[in-house]
Amino acid sequence: AACSSPQPPLVASDVEITRPMPGRHMSAGYLVLTNNTDAPIRIDGATSRQFGMVEMHETTVEDGISRMREIEELVVPANGSVTFERGGKHLMLMRAQNLEQSVSLQLWCNGAPVLSIEYAFPDEPN
């Protein structure tokens, strides 16, 4: 028998959260969500102690015009992944509060936590 524990159902990798610009209270989050189960996983919300509001958004280009729309519900396919990246799906983190060296994010489905993510900002160059 294998001595390893089973993989968690949902995993976040390549996490990057931008530090808000001085005087601004908004940030963006990028990551890859991987579903290790045989069933799709729904995500219908996100929260953070360091931001008053977190939304999932998607940037699309129509007729040469870039538009951003909110994603009400995201489905991570069974044994698949979804990428949040610049110019595509991303997290909008708004109303920064108590922002220090790290950010904790929670992803939700029907009011139940699906995944918790801790992200530490890289040290700023001197």
Features from the language model and the residues they span:
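Bacterial signal peptide processing site
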Residues: 4-6
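Compact, glycine-rich, soluble single-domain proteins
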Residues: 9-126
